[in-house]
Regions:
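Conserved "landmark" site that anchors the functional core of diverse proteins
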Residues: 1-285
Length: 285
């Protein structure tokens, strides 16, 4: 262990996340892990961690953290105010934090989920091979609370020479590529045209299990019920209401709603960072 951090302000649903625990779907346990894996990997690279090291994922507004020992951190995924002891700093950059200083990540102006990586990684106890919090199965460390103290691991390698990553900020709308789902025929031969023809709006009821979308309900050709079948991250289920939901990291491993399409894996970060009220459009890949 190379130090400890204290939670001064947890921020909304701030959890420890890494790249998840794949391979346990047969036990009913989803992969979990960071919803926006690209941002997690970038934050870890900036501080010299392995890409899959455990970091912190928040929702809309980030945490305030006091570090007992000097360290290096990076904040990615969003455009947000970041400061150390009141000094304004940048996102997508390596930040030196002196011993005893407080890192403060404010409310995001763009994007939804900030990621905070610490050199050495968060050294919480692994569960089924991962340090991630699974909000569906309640596995892994609890979401952060004021006064919590988290152990920081030993650095895995030298600090990178590149300290800044020129990353485009999250857009105000998201165009997401999809492929046909296994139950697209439940919506007729033009299922993807129906899906792509609507400007969907992200619902405030969205969470780490899935992004719910509001808009014009999709008509179903079949009204009978579907037996539960295996689900994957990025699957677009159509609920009884006719409204779609994109499954995310903490999704149930089975489900009975028909899957009209599946989001291309490379575009999942766009869904992960889409804020309530933001517009999402789908495009046939």
């Amino acid at each position: 262990m190379s130090g400890t951090l204290e939670v001064v302000r947890p921020g909304p649903l701030t959890t420890v996340q890494d790249l998840g625990r794949p391979g346990h779907a047969h036990l009913g346990v989803p992969r979990s892990g960071a919803v926006d894996r690209d941002s997690l990997k970038l934050a870890n690279r900036l501080v010299g961690n392995e890409e899959g090291a455990a970091a912190l994922e928040a929702t809309l507004s980030g945490p305030a953290l006091r570090f007992e020992e000097a360290t290096v951190v990076a904040v990615t995924g969003v455009v947000a105010p970041v400061s150390v002891d009141g000094e304004d700093l940048e996102v997508n950059a390596a930040i030196d934090v002196p011993a005893g200083a407080v890192l403060d990540v404010g409310t995001a102006a763009a994007g939804l989920r900030p990621y905070v990586a610490v050199r050495g990684g968060i050294a919480s106890e692994p569960v089924l091979g991962s340090r991630s919090r699974d909000t569906l199965s309640a596995l892994g460390p609890e979401p952060l609370a004021k006064g919590d103290r988290l152990a920081i691991g030993e650095p895995a390698g030298p600090r990178p020479a590149v300290a800044v990553a020129p990353v485009a900020p999250p857009g105000s709308d998201a165009v997401v590529r999809v492929t046909p789902g296994p139950r697209a025929d439940w919506f007729g031969p033009d299922a993807l045209k129906l899906l792509a023809g609507e400007a969907w709006t992200v619902s405030p009821e969205s969470n780490r299990s899935g992004t719910r979308l509001d808009g014009t309900p999709l008509p179903r050709l079949r009204q009978d019920e579907l037996r539960s079948e295996g689900m994957v991250e990025g699957a677009i289920q159509v609920r009884h209401s006719g409204l779609p939901m994109v499954l995310l990291a903490d999704h149930p491993t089975t489900g009975g709603y028909p899957v009209i399409a599946v989001v291309v894996a490379e575009d999942l970060p766009k869904i992960a960072q889409a804020r309530p009220g933001q517009e999402v459009r789908f495009r046939d890949a």
